[in-house]
């Protein structure tokens, strides 16, 4: 295998658009990478009770992808909150990694669709917030 391979690092940045087609990007980072992380991806933001809630994927090469969580009062400055992260199962199709969550509400119940091991090759599942 390769040793000390420099991998690209990806974070989540802020952009605005008046029409959803033309975007203004000023380079402002919304979520910073933590020490062992190499990538942040696929943010999904919902607003509940005036709080912006972001679910995003993060990659730590030692554990693979996980789904992280952050909150904001203005949609610009975000604070990561470890308590609300979705972890992996003990065994099965999502026991190695979970990623690319999409959160939505239906009949006042919050659901998350997400991919399992192998970026979803072993399955796609859902979680319900309790």
Predicted regions, residues:
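Carbohydrate-active catalytic/glycan-binding domains of CAZyme proteins
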Residues: 1-130
